[in-house]
């Protein structure tokens, strides 16, 4: 069962965040923690906290499964653009240049590599019962 964690309005540009997000996409969670701890970029701190939140959410949903036994991996990570904070910087001859401070939203989905089987209804038994029914076939004449 998958767990989702979202980071909203992070004060880093989406382009910079995607560089680090691409490093951990599809990687196991423990390896992703190692990658993020050794990454010098500021956005790695945000992604590490987000990954911790996603793992905690998965653990809360699956309390019957031990976290050590589960092989968690990052199923999807998506970095979207959020709003912009617009500023004006004075320029020569009475003009102004616009400064756009970009924000982003990150969505992280964590799932288990090992699929735990759920009990399935026995469809073979119901198929056998249907085929064993006796059917009386007549040709339409009275005898």
Curated annotation (Swiss-Prot):
Keywords: Ribonucleoprotein, Ribosomal protein, RNA-binding, rRNA-binding. Disulfide bonds: none annotated. One of its GO terms (cellular component) is cytosolic large ribosomal subunit. One of its GO terms (molecular function) is structural constituent of ribosome. Signal peptide: none annotated. The keyword Electron transport does not apply. The keyword Secreted does not apply. GO terms for biological process: translation. It comes from the Bacteria. Residues 124-143 are annotated as: Disordered. Part of the 50S ribosomal subunit. Belongs to the universal ribosomal protein uL22 family. This protein binds specifically to 23S rRNA; its binding is stimulated by other ribosomal proteins, e.g. L4, L17, and L20. It is important during the early stages of 50S assembly. It makes multiple contacts with different domains of the 23S rRNA in the assembled 50S subunit and ribosome. HAMAP family: Ribosomal_uL22_B. This is Large ribosomal subunit protein uL22. The lineage of its organism: Bacteria, Pseudomonadati, Bacteroidota, Cytophagia, Cytophagales.
């Amino acid at each position: 069962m998958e767990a989702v964690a979202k980071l909203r309005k992070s004060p880093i540009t989406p382009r910079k965040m995607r560089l680090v997000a691409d490093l951990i996409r599809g990687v196991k969670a423990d390896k992703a923690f190692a990658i993020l701890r050794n990454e010098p970029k500021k956005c790695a701190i945000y992604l590490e906290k987000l990954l911790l939140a996603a793992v905690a959410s998965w653990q809360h949903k699956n309390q019957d499964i031990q976290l050590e036994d589960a092989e968690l991996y990052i199923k999807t990570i998506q970095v979207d653009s959020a709003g912009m904070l617009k500023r004006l910087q004075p320029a020569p001859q009475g003009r102004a240049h616009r400064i756009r401070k970009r924000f982003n939203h990150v969505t992280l989905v964590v799932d288990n590599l090992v699929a735990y089987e759920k009990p399935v209804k026995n469809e073979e038994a119901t198929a056998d019962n249907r085929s064993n029914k006796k059917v009386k076939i007549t040709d339409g004449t009275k005898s």
